[in-house]
């Protein structure tokens, strides 16, 4: 099959969250199975320095009046995956991140920036002769590429199957109606059964309603988003299409995330050399100037610092546990108030708490290898990848039972690989953390859970066949 895979971020070129990890790994896994996959993504500032020399370019014109759209053909050196980069200086050459300015405010022209990406994607899918390659299927990801389904609908194209994957329903890419005329889409699409969304228009809703299949990144999340509690205003539309909605769990690239061969951690280890995890723990504590007592647990957070992630709850419970000797290592950024609260916690417990604001890939590996337990108390979690990384590193996740966390972390029975709580409350989180501390001091029980965790296979190889079956069902 020839699969055109569109995303707004792709690891290792650019990453703000789990979408980049998926977009960087699933196409590689599909190519290993013999399928012809090509990626498309904007040429953000600095991206051209990270790819192979440009092999071919084509000018798609200036449909949005902001400058010519150039499609550049190249590949990602790390895995040889072919990629088309959409270049437009006015839209993508910015020093800030891909979506927001340095103050964390959405770019005012995001509707045009990602309409252009979507338009180019749809054009490429429809007119394969432009690059001498005709896609059999188009795979879109989140709202930034969802508009591509609307362009194909607007152009009355029916012969190209479209799959849209929702990585997080909360980011619906909705815009004011007075911006719609700039999109060059048919006004016929602006209705409650189309891309209209509570008096606005939405890129995500376009991607949902005009797709042949909709996927989410875990089976439990696929069920949750049919309810008002988790549906973020789209549950009605999703219930109407639930016959073409499926949850496929995200995978992990174990070439990147495996303690046996991870070049970013001080001491490699596997299930038979778990004592080396203690060496990583000591190295992490020393790196951060924290108390080096190996007989007390170290909890970790690698996350966006937001209420969605439940990280306000961690702030409520942590002081009581720190008083008993626990440590906390945090890596993340997000809500400015939460950032300041975590930094204040660090100031109050300088020998027990380390906080780094931002995201640093190499440090996240050292953190996963060095902590004992990873905190993920999310109010909702479409899939979650950090708990999958943690499991492979023998780091036990402490999670709220929601979305992909419910599909991958279990507290009891033969599958036990972490700690689980149900209610999104500080009390429930603290009880789970106290259970983990009790288990930590029972070395045999703790190591049994660690070994269970490390045996789970959440590799992309294990889930790729589900994607192939879905694609084939749509093409046939």
Curated annotation (Swiss-Prot):
Belongs to the glycosyltransferase 1 family. Bacterial/plant glycogen synthase subfamily. It catalyses: [(1->4)-alpha-D-glucosyl](n) + ADP-alpha-D-glucose = [(1->4)-alpha-D-glucosyl](n+1) + ADP + H(+). One of its GO terms (biological process) is glycogen biosynthetic process. The keyword Calcium does not apply. Its EC number is 2.4.1.21. Synthesizes alpha-1,4-glucan chains using ADP-glucose. This is Glycogen synthase. Pfam families: Glyco_transf_5 (PF08323), Glycos_transf_1 (PF00534). Keywords: Glycogen biosynthesis, Glycosyltransferase, Transferase. CDD domains: GT5_Glycogen_synthase_DULL1-like. Pathway: Glycan biosynthesis; glycogen biosynthesis. ADP-alpha-D-glucose binds at residue 15. Gene3D superfamilies: Glycogen Phosphorylase B. One of its GO terms (molecular function) is alpha-1,4-glucan glucosyltransferase (ADP-glucose donor) activity. Disulfide bonds: none annotated. The keyword Glycosyltransferase applies. InterPro entries: Glyco_trans_1, GS/SS, Starch_synth_cat_dom.
